[in-house]
Amino acid sequence: MSQHSQYDAPGVPVQPSLSFTQGFLLGQLSVVLLIGAFIKFFIFGEAPAPPSRGLASRTASHHRSYSINQGDNNVSNNNTSGGSPRTLCEKPSTSNVLRPVPSSATNTRSILRKTYYNAIPTQFSHTKQGRHRIQHSTHQPESLDWFNVLIAQTIAQYRQTAYLLKDSPTSSILDSLSAAINDPQKKPSFIDTIKVTDISLGEEFPIFSNCRVIVVDDPNSDGGRLQALMDVDLSDDNLSLAIETSLILNYPKPRSAVLPVALSVSVVRFSGTLCISLIPAATEQSPSSAPTPDASNLNVRTLFQHISAELNGTAANPTANPEKKGVPKTNLAFSFLPDYRLDLSVRSLIGSRSRLQDVPKVAQLVEARIHSWFEERVVEPRVQVVGLPDFWPRKGRTGVRPGEDAEAAAAVAAASASSRGGAPEATPSVPEEAIIDDSPVRPGLRFRGPAGRYDSGSSFDELPRAGPGLGEPLDIPGSMPGGRAQ
């Protein structure tokens, strides 16, 4: 009875949540959205920026931050530039074409941050003498192997040039050195004419190493001045100079006695720390922009001197000097730290008959004089300032390496001939013999006259071909001498 009641009870039908049509439309819509997202983000999306060299080895703190994407820096840049960023639709005025340089462009910390160089903060300490103390950098010192190779090539070229010009009457190193040491304004009267007997420019090269960049105090630059320190060592070389002269005794009468002297000075070893820095030169005020002195602020004598200078032409004239005025140039300043080492070997020979050889006192005097000369020029706090040349590319300084121009032209001609696949046309720089022999496709025999009839500059169209006339003898390449074309 219970089983019969179970079969007789009507089952409750399950209602589906979505119909078949609604599910089909939802599936199609999801597929369309997926395809649209794929096309938008994978096909029309912007390619990622290529990573810069050495980016993988940099730490997270080394990542470059662009000020255009930062709100604070963008506001500061807008304030320094004097307004909102310039758009392409705006037409800049003729006086404001070049955008202003940010004030932090030459800041030391900004340069170190953008070049990923770890240097200590600009904390300066002074010694008792008032000089700043060298602040060592926390960056790892760098080797200068590539710099040593360039310096060695330069020195080797100078040595070779000096040897090739040893017999030149104007550019000889012997004549230049003799004229320098025999300068009558510097040579004492008790020293006779100095004759150079031997010069050795050496065979070895200086080795630079352990380069590091530090920050030194400079009131003329923002945040201090960057300075590169590198160790230099030159040893086991034969740099030497030998001279002969005479000491003259001019009392009681001129040339009362003459004492021959021969000296030879050799550099045994030199080592020290070289300091290199770039110093921007001060902008020279152009004469046109120089203010005219006011007569009320000057007395009569000063005003008269100024007017006389202008009338006499001593004042600067912008048209008289072809060089550009008011353009600052960067200077290279280099010097050595006081802890340098310069070992010399001095040999002397005094007298004519009874000669004194290698007198210690003479060696001490010569070494002291050389050390004094060196310290007065390139030892801190004295520096040597050299103006850097103009490195802007110019047409007048453009050159082609020898032997590569002709090879490049021949390669271009051969490539164009092979790409056409037919009879190549001759160029004025390629001889006709090379064109005929190197032709990749030979549709038929090409006839040419005897050698010397046509110059190498004639083109392919000017070569003789088989004409309609039958009486003209034709030469076939490879035929016997005197043979006739049948």
Swiss-Prot record:
Polar residues bias locations: 92-103
Domain of life of the source: Eukaryota
Predominant location category: endoplasmic reticulum
InterPro entries: Mmm1, MMM1_dom, SMP_LBD
Topology within the bilayer: Single-pass type I membrane protein
All ranges on the Lumenal side of the membrane: 1-23
Residue spans crossing the bilayer: 24-44
Biased composition (Low complexity): 67-84, 413-426
GO molecular function: lipid binding
SMP-LTD domain residues: 140-389
CDD domains: SMP_Mmm1 (cd21671)
Cystines in this chain: none
Any single GO BP term: mitochondrial genome maintenance
Cytoplasmic side stretches: 45-486
Compartments where located: Endoplasmic reticulum membrane
Renumbered residue ranges of the record's region Disordered: 52-103, 413-486
UniProt keyword annotations, A-Z: Endoplasmic reticulum, Lipid transport, Lipid-binding, Membrane, Transmembrane, Transmembrane helix, Transport
GO CC term (a single one): endoplasmic reticulum membrane
Family, as annotated: Belongs to the MMM1 family.
Function per UniProt: Component of the ERMES/MDM complex, which serves as a molecular tether to connect the endoplasmic reticulum (ER) and mitochondria. Components of this complex are involved in the control of mitochondrial shape and protein biogenesis, and function in nonvesicular lipid trafficking between the ER and mitochondria. The mdm12-mmm1 subcomplex functions in the major beta-barrel assembly pathway that is responsible for biogenesis of all outer membrane beta-barrel proteins, and acts in a late step after the SAM complex.
Quaternary state and interactors: Homodimer. Component of the ER-mitochondria encounter structure (ERMES) or MDM complex, composed of mmm1, mdm10, mdm12 and mdm34. A mmm1 homodimer associates with one molecule of mdm12 on each side in a pairwise head-to-tail manner, and the SMP-LTD domains of mmm1 and mdm12 generate a continuous hydrophobic tunnel for phospholipid trafficking.
Domain notes: The SMP-LTD domain is a barrel-like domain that can bind various types of glycerophospholipids in its interior and mediate their transfer between two adjacent bilayers.
Protein's name in the database: Maintenance of mitochondrial morphology protein 1
Natural source organism: Talaromyces marneffei (strain ATCC 18224 / CBS 334.59 / QM 7333) (Penicillium marneffei)
